[in-house]
Curated annotation (Swiss-Prot):
Subcellular location as annotated: Cytoplasm
Record EC number: 2.3.2.6
UniProtKB keywords: Acyltransferase, Cytoplasm, Transferase
UniProt protein name: Leucyl/phenylalanyl-tRNA--protein transferase
InterPro entries: Acyl_CoA_acyltransferase, Leu/Phe-tRNA_Trfase, Leu/Phe-tRNA_Trfase_C
Biological process, per Gene Ontology: protein catabolic process
Entry's family note: Belongs to the L/F-transferase family.
Broad enzyme group: transferase
Listed GO CC annotations: cytoplasm
Key word Transferase present: yes
Length: 212
């Protein structure tokens, strides 16, 4: 996928810089957990989830109806970061982790977590700004864990008045769930609109049931 990258030499990434970048349609990544450098990405085509078009498969529908899990919001945000970074390759380095933790402390970064009897089964996390949610990463430790987290996340975003769910890039997996690409100009128009609107990520209790 074509995208523009802007290397950032040290000094350090800051939470304020990250927020200003998100508002401009740019997001940071690194080359790996042990690589201290951060680069800025501005894709020519941007991945988004339609908040009314998330595809719930029969298997996922059965999982939701069967239950056997609980949903928590921000219960273990640091653990979610660790879970997302615990893969090869990873784009989350120490500076990014520190900034996400700081944004979480400011109420701007959130995790939707799926828990079962064995612990954290899967999760997704991202950053909120106005009525935009910037999805950063997700992981599963049990079958369907991240899909369950996504389903509950989208329900929460819709209830909270969000208008944009930015996935940054799209993969075949995300496309199978309904994600698609927007040209940069269209994405920026949607982002500009979303930034002017109020939204509330915490408008729902964390254990609200998902009816499918």
């Amino acid at each position: 996928m074509a995208h523009d990258m802007y290397p950032q030499p040290r000094p350090l990434l800051t939470p304020d810089l990250m927020i200003r970048a998100y508002a401009a349609g740019i997001f940071p990544m690194s080359e790996g957990a042990d690589n201290p450098e951060v680069f800025w990405v501005d894709p020519q085509r941007r991945g988004v989830f339609p908040l009314n078009g998330f595809h719930i498969s029969r298997t996922l529908r059965r999982q939701i109806r069967f239950g056997g899990y609980s949903v928590h919001i921000n219960r273990d945000f640091a653990g979610v970061l660790d879970g997302c970074a615990d893969r090869e390759p990873t784009w989350i380095n120490a500076d990014l982790t520190a900034c996400y933790l700081a944004l979480h402390a400011q109420g701007l970064a959130h995790s939707v977590e799926i828990w079962d009897d064995e612990g954290l089964a899967g999760a997704v996390f991202g950053v909120t700004l106005g009525a935009a949610f910037f999805g950063e990463s997700m992981f599963s430790r049990r079958t369907g864990g991240s899909k369950l987290a996504l389903a509950h996340l989208i329900h929460r975003l819709r209830a909270g008045g969000f208008t944009l769910f930015d996935t940054q890039f799209v993969t075949d997996h995300l496309m199978s769930l309904g994600a698609f690409e927007l040209p940069r100009s269209d994405y920026r128009a949607e982002l500009s609109h979303a930034l002017q609107l109020p939204a509330d990520f915490m408008s729902l209790p964390e254990d609200v049931p998902l009816v499918v």
